[in-house]
């Protein structure tokens, strides 16, 4: 009886955690994929080496959204992947396709697009695109953390190390 109860608890726990872990892994893949454009955008956004290093800690609790250059880098990276309209707002269809280009993409795509759109609406009045996109990124990060889909720094660093060893 005790063994059966343990099995039921284990199965329930696994069925509850599996979608969350899948979402976190998709978010990790999207983050790493999006980050590939950072080096290309470093100069255009006037990002110093120090600020570029900070950027790698985007998902950490103590990451600060206080430097305009970071918003400019996100703007450039978004343009690199054709994720923005001419007015520097999210291109919903292209963003959806970008997210869906990663493994297990169907899990999170619509949710991510909705989160970003909601954050954009909150900060739409800001005329400076770099500052606005930085505020949208801050809102998006907070929303992902609240939804439990933000990847941990440990997960990202492990993946980054594995990828660098392969290349």
From Swiss-Prot:
Pfam families on file: PBP_GOBP (PF01395)
Protein name, UniProt field: General odorant-binding protein 1
Family to which the UniProt record says this protein belongs: Belongs to the PBP/GOBP family.
InterPro entries listed in its UniProt record: Odorant/phero-bd_Lep, PBP/GOBP, PBP_GOBP_sf
Organism field: Antheraea pernyi
Disulfide bonds: 41-76, 72-130, 119-139
Functional summary from the UniProt entry: Present in the aqueous fluid surrounding olfactory sensory dendrites and are thought to aid in the capture and transport of hydrophobic odorants into and through this fluid.
Tissue: Antenna.
Top-rank lineage group of the source organism: Eukaryota
A GO biological-process term: sensory perception of smell
GO MF annotations in UniProt: odorant binding
Record keywords: Disulfide bond, Olfaction, Sensory transduction, Signal, Transport
Signal peptide (from-to): 1-22
